[in-house]
Structures are given as C-alpha cells and as structure tokens.
Regions:
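Gly/Ser/Thr-enriched, mixed-charge loops and adjacent short helices
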Residues: 44, 61-194
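Catalytic-loop motifs flanking and including active-site residues across diverse enzymes
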Residues: 10, 32, 144, 221-225
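Short beta-strands and strand-loop turn motifs
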Residues: 1, 93-97, 210
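Glycine-rich phosphate-binding loop of actin/hexokinase-like ATP-binding domains
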Residues: 51, 67-82, 206-225
C-alpha cells in the first residue's frame, strides 16, 4: 500500500479476504507499485500474485487496487473477466484461514535497485558509485522516501535537503505527482537552494518520476523522454 490514510484498512480487508479462502498472504505494509510487481519475479520463491493498494497521484481521499502476476499488471478487461467468472462460482465452505505473514520487502527491493546501479555504473568505488553527487528527493509524503534513504544514501550520494520523505497519508505539502506544477516547483526549489546535482520527484506509489537539473530545468512528462 501507499501512504494514504485508508491504506491500512483496505489492505487489511484484502488480506482477510484472501486468507479466508486459504491463500498464504504476506503484508508488506508501505511499499511501491514497482516493488509489488517485482515480488512476483524476484527471489527463490516469487509470489504468485500481488495487490497494491493505491490511487496513484489522485487526492488522498481516493484509493484502489492494482493486481499483478509475473506476467504483468491486470488491465480493465482482465478485471471484468474475473468479475464475470466470480458470478459463476458456487459458494463453498471456506478452508481454515491462514495467518498473515509480515515482511520488509522494501529493504530487499531497495538492495536490488542499489545492486543494479552499482553494476551499471561500474565505478572504481564499486560500493559507492554516487559518492560526490548531491541528489535531493521529493517523495511528497508518499511511499518514495525509501529511494533516498535505502538506495541513494548507501550508494554514497548526499541526500541532504531532500523533502517530504516521511509518509503522510493526507499529503500536507503538495500532491505527489510529477505532472503537477506545484510539485515540480517544490523539487526545483530544493535543487536550487541546495545547489544539488539532481532532483528526483515521485508520485505516491513510485511508478512515475520527474527530475530537475542543476540549473533548474524540469524534466517531466514528455520532456523526461
């Protein structure tokens, strides 16, 4: 789930429902959408499926579900097919509910991202390829704070001046949306004030990002491409 205030309740209901049908469920708590997909393809025993509770960049009082398997995310047509199939299922006695497990998958995922960066940069200081770079992150109080604290910092980057890394489900500072003018103005201000080498801003569930260059040039939407 992302940081929305309704996230714990909705994810709890989803886990309860899956568990009641005999599924072995694991609660990742605060997570990103890309991480939820990656849990279906990473590790010795990938998960059969994953559900992300998020409404992406929409206001804090919205929420929804994103479904993933190792084949990717379910689209609207997939959801319609599932709902149609559900109408044909004859209710049966549910098996004994399974206990929900807890896992800090975001630390595993962050280590995976850091490893990819180390292998890609191939710096002389393999463990700290970003040493000497000042990179500020604006997570908008969504789920993206981990990227600064668990990816960039261990790689040697200076993340001082990063903003709104702590999750807050009412988004008190700005909408976590790299397409929003106020959000981009926030990360641009951070880059210029800190004289940073790069600024990165994420949406709430961290599947979209924007960037700001040292001179304040914004790279988001089509400009990012």
């Amino acid at each position: 789930r992302d940081s929305r205030i309704s996230g714990p309740a909705i994810s709890g209901w989803a886990l309860e429902g899956f568990g009641a049908e005999g599924a072995l469920c694991t609660n990742f708590a605060l997570a990103s959408t890309p991480a939820m997909f990656m849990c279906t393809v990473m590790g010795a025993q990938p998960f059969d499926g994953a559900v992300m509770v998020t409404a992406s960049h929409l206001p804090y009082n919205r929420n929804g579900l994103k479904f993933f398997t190792s084949a990717g995310g379910l689209e609207g047509s997939d959801i319609k097919a599932i709902l149609a199939q559900a109408q044909l299922i004859t209710p049966q006695a549910a098996p004994q509910a399974q206990q929900v497990q807890q896992q800090d998958f975001m630390s595993v995922y962050a280590a995976h991202l850091a490893s990819l960066i180390r292998d890609g940069v191939k710096a002389k200081d393999y463990l700290h390829p970003l040493a000497g770079l000042h990179i500020v992150v604006d997570a908008g109080n969504g789920a993206g704070g981990f990227f600064a604290e668990k990816v960039l910092a261990p790689l040697g980057a200076d993340i001082s001046g990063s903003r709104y890394l702590a999750p807050d489900g009412i988004f008190p500072n700005h909408i976590p949306n790299p397409e929003d003018a106020a959000a981009m103005a926030s990360i641009r201000q951070a880059v210029l004030e800190e004289k940073a080498d790069l600024g990165i801003i994420f949406d709430t569930d961290v599947d979209r990002a924007g960037a700001v260059l040292p001179d304040g040039e914004e790279l988001n939407r089509n400009r990012l491409i």
